[in-house]
Amino acid sequence: MERVADGVWLLRGDLRKSMNVYFLEDGDGVVQFDAGSRAMVKSARAAAQELGGVKRVVLSHAHADHRGTAPSMGVPVFCHPDEVADAESDASIAPYMELSELPFAPVRWIYPFLLRRWDGGAVKIDGTVSEGEEIAGFQVLHFPGHAPGLIGLWRQSDRLAIVSDVVYLVDSTRLKPLPAGEASVPHPAWAWDHAKAKQSVHRLAALEPAVVCAGHERPLRGENLRETLERAADKF
């Protein structure tokens, strides 16, 4: 676990430590944002305990690699209203995903296995969060596209964006990280609405963040993040 900003800790785990779970300081405990993969349950529990205990889990969206620890944390779980049905489903592959669109056959074949491996199963959703609400000092922003109810968190004071899969810092078509300093819009194979996914990346770019914490790999930092994100929106 590493501290990535004031009151924000990142736990990386599973496949080449590319799955990210964030803990946000909230009074005498923490809020967990995103839930990584099922293999991270033990480390997520330990991290939460070290930080004073987790109060609730907030899912950025309901994909298998972002809900994995949620059923096992023993606290209320929240998500955007448009993600509730998928979060409470036992399906590891969202109904709108088109894995046949991935360009390389070996990757197309392995993803169904990986998604089942990462998934912690159906999640009981205890409440919802929407655009404009506040979580641990962050503003909730709705970034639809990759998933219908994908949300990110924005803190104006240090221009910190925690955005899960609004942008990818990995090449999901090859299962490897992108070169340092690069980002992309998620591949259309994963998207509920790819055009909206690109619009969401443009919206993120317009915020002019100083740091972007995504759902996979290390935070993206630099002086020209707006330009990086604008290029990312047109990657696919």
Please describe what each predicted stretch is.
Residues 1-47, 153-169:
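Conserved beta-strand hairpin/beta-sheet module of binuclear metal-dependent hydrolase folds
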Residues 31-33, 58, 77, 160-162, ...:
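Residue-level marker for buried hydrophobic side chains located in beta-strands
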Residues 37-38, 139-142, 148-223:
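Metallo-beta-lactamase
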Residues 39-127:
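Active-site HxH/HxHxD metal-binding segment of metal-dependent hydrolases
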Residues 49-53, 133-136, 156, 207:
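Glycine-rich phosphate-binding loop signature in dinucleotide/nucleotide-binding domains
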Residues 52-56, 64-68, 72, 131, ...:
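Soluble, non-transmembrane catalytic domains of enzymes that act on hydrophobic metabolites at membranes
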Residues 108-136, 191-203:
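Alpha-helix-centered segments that form part of catalytic cores
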Residues 217-236:
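Binuclear metal-ion centers of metallo-dependent hydrolases, dominated by the metallo-beta-lactamase
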